[in-house]
Amino acid sequence: MQIQSFYHSASLKTQEAFKSLQKTLYNGMQILSGQGKAPAKAPDARPEIIVLREPGATWGNYLQHQKTSNHSLHNLYNLQRDLLTVAATVLGKQDPVLTSMANQMELAKVKADRPATKQEEAAAKALKKNLIELIAARTQQQNGLPAKEAHRFAAVAFRDAQVKQLNNQPWQTIKNTLTHNGHHYTNTQLPAAEMKIGAKDIFPSAYEGKGVCSWDTKNIHHANNLWMSTVSVHEDGKDKTLFCGIRHGVLSPYHEKDPLLRQAGAENKAKEVLAAALFSKPELLNRALEGEAVSLKLVSVGLLTASNIFGKEGTMVEDQMRAWQSLTQPGKMIHLKIRNKDGDLQTVKIKPDVAAFNVGVNELALKLGFGLKASDSYNAEALHQLLGNDLRPEARPGGWVGEWLAQYPDNYEVVNTLARQIKDIWKNNQHHKDGGEPYKLAQRLAMLAHEIDAVPAWNCKSGKDRTGMMDSEIKRELISFHQTHMLSAPGSLPDSGGQKIFQKVLLNSGNLEIQKQNTGGAGNKVMKNLSPEVLNLSYQKRVGDENIWQSVKGISSLITS
């Protein structure tokens, strides 16, 4: 839809919408319209200009020193600038209204970052809504649409433009390091666009350096927010991988209304997860490319709340489980297209075996009990695959774990301990409560999968918040185990040393960068303060530092989908 120039034909309502938006933006920046007066420098303002993405710079290094404020003004500027860019995509790059706003923002830039005021935070949160209202008012005036229809058009147009902007930005490998007790650990998040054997990514529908953000909820061709997550330690002059797994958004393209297309899309996403899992096993991938039909074991851990009372995640879980079931019938072999080192598509044959779990980890599941019964109906079957039919804690493990232990591997004790912990959790329904550790079952399932040479994969709805916290919990426990050679007891809070590890992981795992990649702002929505307090999960106790907790929360509360 072509929208003509605003100034010569604007209706009164359109003018009012613009003035409201202008007031919100300008007041949020604490400048006077037309004067470009910069905000006064706060007493605790840091003197340097903050520049992220410079060589060696990470969100962790930056946020770790943000002791004086919940939100950085620079972060709010960046978020608002991105939203104006999206609006300009809808209204036109030369739109005089948005150009005026952008110019005012340039004038309002400060030379040093400082804590944002509550007024600035409110303005940043309201800007998206106000931009949509401006687009709606202009659309209504130009096309004579009813107000509701114009607003619906504006919301869809803005969302589509925002998704396109997020998808088309470069999706690149994120690599951060942390040091604890003299050991150097590297956290690597490798996006689908950089899962390459040669010059191109391995997927038949190439990513070409781009990605699929968590808000692209109708995409039936690609998995959302697909990454390979690795943590390694440098010792004896070389890097040793402690853990490698695949993370992603839910397999359901849940805003696709056609049930056949939605299921086809879920299966396409599942195939991409399998391709990524194969990529994470270079030796197995080479055998497949040489023509061998290879077996691939994958432990999928969904983190959704399997209920439709809030958010329809129950239906999403059903879509995901149906996709796994369709691809993993007993004895079934599937053919995947993989782009080889020469850039040519090659068919590989795999026999996938997927143990598909779903473990609710949010307040709805762990505080109110939503979705637990539905999830456990899937979990019982998956546990039998993983641990055999006898799930008594004292019983010898069967299933995949029993097969692994029969080889008397070097990690026999670790595998046996993790298996026993999982069976204890299951027997006592500890995964139904926070109990000081919301991810107690999910995290141990992923760790056990890695230890028995299966591929761990995990996801929530978006692949960034609960998925990111799972990623951090796994890495916290792995680094702690590497240092102490002891696994934490289920439901235990980290001690002071464990909290220090967790704090470093939360800020340097790459998860803040992934959240920014998907939404335009870094911050994890898992971190929240609810009322009454009894509804809150145990993350303030687990993190042990209010400033770190706020840094991990970031500007997530200001971002709306």
UniProtKB/Swiss-Prot annotation:
**Gene Ontology molecular function, alphabetical:** phosphatase activity
EC number from the UniProt entry: 3.1.3.-
What top-level class of enzyme does the UniProt entry assign? hydrolase
Keywords attached to this entry: Hydrolase, Secreted, Virulence
Relay the domain remarks: Contains the consensus sequence Cys-X(5)-Arg characteristic of Mg-independent phosphatases.
Q: Provide the family line.
A: Belongs to the phosphatase IpgD/SopB family.
**What is the official name of this protein in its record?**
Inositol phosphate phosphatase SopB
Q: What is the lineage of its organism?
A: Bacteria, Pseudomonadati, Pseudomonadota, Gammaproteobacteria, Enterobacterales
Instruction: Write the gene name.
Output: sopB
